């Protein structure tokens, strides 16, 4: 069936994602960081010189950590090998947007940076900090041959391309321990009611669900995955646009539905402990050598972290796997994704070389081969991915009837995931959220753009 593209707020139809399985992928959420939108894993700054080259050196600033960072370093090493440009690489996983803004304001921007959310992309493009892709030696009009149209739109502001899609991950992946499910005599649930029944059965075998809500963006992903399935795609599109109304009853209804699973009864250690727990520690509660729970919700990037960092002895299909986020309400076959875009903040020759390298199939195949991401480049086929978990992730996006960008990342800079996530932290702790106040702040942020 032919599916059409709608794009009032970085919205994607699966027709443009077919390349993920028949020759390429599409762009996502990455995993964000403890206290900053878009960042990867909890922890401080990292990075340092990665490569040196005869042509000179560029400065690259990233928000990634763990397996995502290691994958990116392989891309940087390949860039040096192919172009002769060295890379001074820096990463800040906790205060990334503040660090990047300070560098820009101080007149010392990195040559290349990962942009922490679409709100920041709009800000940096409009204030002139980001350079147009067309000014970096790339004919932007030809890129539709290599990327699904919607993913290019993710880096576009007022009709001009400022950033390139780097990678994406499906946010509709529910991760679990097959051995725990088997021991509890449960199967992967398909509906929300079945999901709650599974939690009830496994709550003491050894525990139902792990949660790392210290990184509050994890809660925004929960909200978005339920909202789009319960309220529907049109309501989702509106909520995460400047026309959104956070006092609409559908918002609190989604929170109430979320609390049916995210509560003291089912979250290992209880909600108070979960609010103080990093999301990577929650992954370890499920996929460590001695599991404390059977289920963990987050995007496709979890597999690379669990296998690459948490427990290299995991076996796909035996001790790690995923199934689609359960259906909620009447909306079926929809999902969300998160993605990162890369932009240039200088027009140096090295920055131009990196942007030109990044759009090549080779660069994207190096990235895909690590298993940390799904590439949006059409030149990347499923044979580029290292395991079945990532192949199925790409296929799931290709098959979805409708797919939407991570909603919190569409909100204006300064609101994005942090204020939304903080509101949801209060909600799971049993406190009433003042959505009218949140609506006032969101509207003011939209009006200020």
Where in the sequence are the language-model features?
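Hinge/lid segment of periplasmic solute-binding proteins
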Residues: 47-52, 118-172
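Short, solvent-exposed loop/beta-turn-alpha elements that line the ligand-binding surface or hinge
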Residues: 134-147, 213, 230-253, 308-315, ...
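Extracytoplasmic/periplasmic solute-binding protein
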Residues: 160-166, 172, 196-244
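Long, aromatic- and glycine/proline-rich binding clefts that accommodate carbohydrate-like moieties
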Residues: 368-419
């Amino acid at each position: 069936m032919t599916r059409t593209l709608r794009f009032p707020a970085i919205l994607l139809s699966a027709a443009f994602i077919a390349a993920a399985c028949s020759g390429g992928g599409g762009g996502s959420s990455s995993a964000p960081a403890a206290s900053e939108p878009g960042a990867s894993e909890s922890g401080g700054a990292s990075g340092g010189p990665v490569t040196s080259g005869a042509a000179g050196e560029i400065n690259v600033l990233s928000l990634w950590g763990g397996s995502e960072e290691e994958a990116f370093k392989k891309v940087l090493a390949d860039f040096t090998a192919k172009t002769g440009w060295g890379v001074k690489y820096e990463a800040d996983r906790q205060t990334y947007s503040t660090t990047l803004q300070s560098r820009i304001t101080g007149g010392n921007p990195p040559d290349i940076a990962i942009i922490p959310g679409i709100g920041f992309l709009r800000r940096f493009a409009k204030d002139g900090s980001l350079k147009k892709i067309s000014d970096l030696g790339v004919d932007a009009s030809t890129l539709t041959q290599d990327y699904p149209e919607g993913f290019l739109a993710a880096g576009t502001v007022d009709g001009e391309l400022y950033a390139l899609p780097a990678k994406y991950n499906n946010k509709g992946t529910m991760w679990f321990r097959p051995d725990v499910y088997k021991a509890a005599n449960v199967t992967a649930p398909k509906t929300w009611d079945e999901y709650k029944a599974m939690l009830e059965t496994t709550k003491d075998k050894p525990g139902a669900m792990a949660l790392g809500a210290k990184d509050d963006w994890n809660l925004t992903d929960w909200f978005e995955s339920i909202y789009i399935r319960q309220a529907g795609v049109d309501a989702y599109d509106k909520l995460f646009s400047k026309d959104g109304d956070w006092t609409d009853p559908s918002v609190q209804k989604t929170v109430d539905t979320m609390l049916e699973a995210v509560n003291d009864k089912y979250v290992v250690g209880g909600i108070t402990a979960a609010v103080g727990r990093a999301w990577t520690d929650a992954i370890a509660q499920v996929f460590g050598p001695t599991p404390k729970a059977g289920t963990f919700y987050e995007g496709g990037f979890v597999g690379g972290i669990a296998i690459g960092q948490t427990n290299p002895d995991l076996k796909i299909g035996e001790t790690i796997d995923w199934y689609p986020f359960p259906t909620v309400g009447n909306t079926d076959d929809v999902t969300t994704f998160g993605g990162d875009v890369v932009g240039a903040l200088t027009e140096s020759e090295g920055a131009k070389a990196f942007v030109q390298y990044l759009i090549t199939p080779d660069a994207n195949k190096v990235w895909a081969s690590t298993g940390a991401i799904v590439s949006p480049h059409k030149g990347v086929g499923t044979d580029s991915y290292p395991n079945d978990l990532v192949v199925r992730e790409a296929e799931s996006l290709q098959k979805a009837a409708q797919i939407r960008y991570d909603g919190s990342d569409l909100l204006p800079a300064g609101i994005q995931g942090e204020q939304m996530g903080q509101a949801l932290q209060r909600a799971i702790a049993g406190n009433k959220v003042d959505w009218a106040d949140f609506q006032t702040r969101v509207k003011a942020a939209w009006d200020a753009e």
